[in-house]
Amino acid sequence: MILKDFNSNWKFEKENECILVDLPHDAMLHEKRYLGGPCGVGGAYFSGGFYTYTKSFMVPKEFINHSIHLHVLGAYRNSLVYVNNQEVYSHKYGYTDYFVELTKYLNYGKTNEIKITVDNTLVPNSRWYSGAGLYRGVELYIGGMDHFNINDIKLNTVSLDPITLSYTIPYTSRKKLDVLMEIYDEDKCIKKNKGASGMLNIDATPWDLDNPKLYTFKFYLMDKDEIIDTYSLEYGFRTLEYTTKGFYLNGKKTILKGACLHHDNGILGAKSIYDAEVKRLFILKNAGFNAIRSAHNPASQHLLKACDRLGILVMDELVDMWLYHKTEYDYATDFKDNYIKDLKSMMDKDYNHPSVIMYSLGNELASPTTLDKEGFRILNELCDYIHKNDYRPSTMGVNFTNLEREELNAHKERYKMMEVYTNSDEIVDDYNKIVTRFGYGMAEIACAPDSERVSIDTFKVLDLAGYNYAYKRYDLDSKIHPERIIVGTETMCEDIYKNYERMKKYPQVIGDFIWTGIDYLGEVGIGGYFDHDHHFQKPYPWILANGGAFDLLGYPTGEAYLAMVTYGKATLELASYIYDEDETKSAWRWTNSRNTYTYKDDVIGKDIVVEVYSIYPIVELFVNGKSLGKKEIVNGFTTYKFPYEKGSIKAIGYKDNKAFEEKILSSANESKLTARIDYSGKELTYIYFEYKDRNNIIDTTKEEIIKVSLDGATLVGIGSANPRTEDNYIKNEAHTFLGACMIAVKRNAAHATIKGSDSKDTIDITI
C-alpha cells in the first residue's frame, strides 16, 4: 500500500463561508462563542454546525487495476462520505477512525471529487469541548487488487527470553501469494522471514519506558519474484503481566504513574497533529508521569505514535456514555447499534502499539450494575470480544456515586448536596453536576454497602477494577477482595503523594491516573475556585476547565510540583497564591498556586500562601532574608501564610539537620516582551511570548495584547492559559495571561519570519 498525503487543499464550507483548509481541521473554532451558546458549559459556549469538506483529485488511468482506500482518522460527528456525488459510507461516532474503499466509485483518467459532510448541529452532545469536522485528518492508500489487509496485521510479543513474536499478516487475493517480512533496526535489516502467520524468534532490544526501542517492519506481498504490495509499521517488543502482586512490564514491576488527558490540544482546539501530541507528552514525561488515560474516548493515531516513541503507557478508553444520556444529544443515541463496531475500530487501531496496555470500556456509566440487565449483557459482550481478539485486559472507570438511576433517586434525601441549581434555580440532575456536589465525599460513598452491592458483579466481569475517586476502598478491598487487581482510573491531584504510598503498600493497586495532567477546553470551571454566585458551572466567557497539573500552555501549577516530588523529578520547589478566605476550592483544583512571587502593588500587605514541595523532611522559608521558621514536610509539601512584600523568598531543604538545597523565587522588576522557541518539529513550531525582566523572571502581572504576523508560515493556533477569555484561538492576536501567551505555526517555506508586537515593541523570530 502506498500512503499518499491527502490532507492539503480541501474546500471547507459552513453556512455562507467557503475557504481552503489543510487537514486536520477543527470546524468548531470557526463557530461563535457567546452567552447562552448551545454547546453550553461542557462545550465552552461554542455553537454546533453542519460542515462540508470537498477535494478534487486526478486518478491516473494506470490505477484502474488498483485498490484505493480512504482512511478517515476522526470526524466529529455523523459523517457521510460521497465519491463523485454518490454516497458510499456513513459513520456515527466522532472518535473512531474508519476506512472507505473508493475503487469502484472512481473515474480513472479523470478528475474525481470526494465530499465528506459532518453534522454536528445537535448540541450539546459532549461534556467537554469536542471540536468538530475532520479534526484528525485523512489518508489515502493505494495498492494492487491483491493487497495487504493493513488494519488486520497483528504483531504480539509472547515472551522476551528469547524474544518471540506471534504474527498474522493477512491479505486479499484470489490466489495464494507469499509474504516476506523484514525487520529493521534503523537502516540495518536484523531479520527476514517468509510466511503470513506463525511464531518468530528475534535478537532485539525490548521496548520499555526508559528505552522505547522501536523497529520498522516491512511487509512484501510476493507473486514469485514480483512484489505485488508493500506495507510498513513501527513496533516495539514488550510483554505485559497483571497480578495481585502488581503490573509487570517486561517482567519488571511497574507502578502506573498516570494522568487523564483530554483529546484537545489547547490552542489548536481538537486538531490532532503529531508534533502537538509530542509537546504535551514531553511535559508529562518530564514531570515523572509514565502513563495516560485517553479521557474519555479513543486516542488519536498521532497520540499513540508519540507514546510509542516517548515511552508512555496508554489506557485507551472507548466512550463516555452507554445507554443513558449525559447530555441531550450525546452518543447514547447511537451506542447500542455500534458498540462492537466502535470497540473493533479502537482495538484494530491500537493492536500494534506497544504503548497501549489496557482497554477501558467507559467512564462513570449509569450502567452496567447489578440492577441493569441490558447494560450487564453489553458489558459481557464487550469483554468477550476483547478476550477473543486481543491479549490486553479490560477495565472501566467506575464512579461509585453514579449508582443505577433508581438507586441514585433513592439517595437524594440522604445526600442533600445532590441538588444542584442552575442560575435560574431549576433543579438539574446532570450527573456531572451531582458528583461535583459530592466532591471530596466520593471516596466515602465508594465504601458504602450500596456501592459494593451494585458494583460487585461488574468487577467480576472486568479484568481490572477501575476506581474513580475511590482511594478509600484500597484498604477495604485488600481485605474483602484480595483477588481484585485495581487501577485508580481517576483520582484527585492533591492525593497523588498519598496514593503513591498506598500503591506501594497495596500491590494489587497497580496504578493511578490523576484528573488531569493538562488543562483542557470545555467543562468550564470544573477546577475553578468559586464564590457564592458561581460554583461548578462557570458562566461565559469561561472556556477552560481550569484543572490539571499543568496549565493550557504547559506551565506547572503547585499540583505539578507535588507530582514531580512524588515521582522523583524534583527535590525542592516553590509556588504561591493570593489568600482569599471567601473563596471555596473546587474538588478538582486543590491549589491555585503558581511558580511566581510577582504580584501587583495592591497585593502588598495582603496575605499570600507559599507552598514548599520537597523530598527533604524539614524545610525553612525566608522572606527577604527573614526566617519564618522550619516546618515538617507532610505528604510532599508544607505551606506558609504571610503578608506579601516584594523581594524574594528562599526555601532551604534539611536532612539530618544539614542544609542540602535551596530554592529562590524573586519578584520581577521592570519587564519587556520576549520570545522563545519552545518546540520545533517537522510540522509545528511553538513560540512563547513572555514578559521578562533583566534576570529572566516572568512578570506574571502582565496582561497585554500580542499581535502576530507571519511570512513563510501559517498560524495554527494562538492563545494563553486564561480560563476566562473571549480571545479566539485562530485569530492573529491574543492577550497574555500570567505574563505569557503562545503561538503554534506551520512553516511553508524554507525559512519563515514571525513578528510579535505589543503596544511598545516588535520582536522578529526566524524559524
Where are these regions (language model features)?
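Aromatic sugar-binding surface patches on proteins
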Residues: 96-99, 196-201, 634-638, 725-742
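Edge beta-strands of extracellular beta-sandwich domains
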Residues: 230-235, 657-669, 760-767
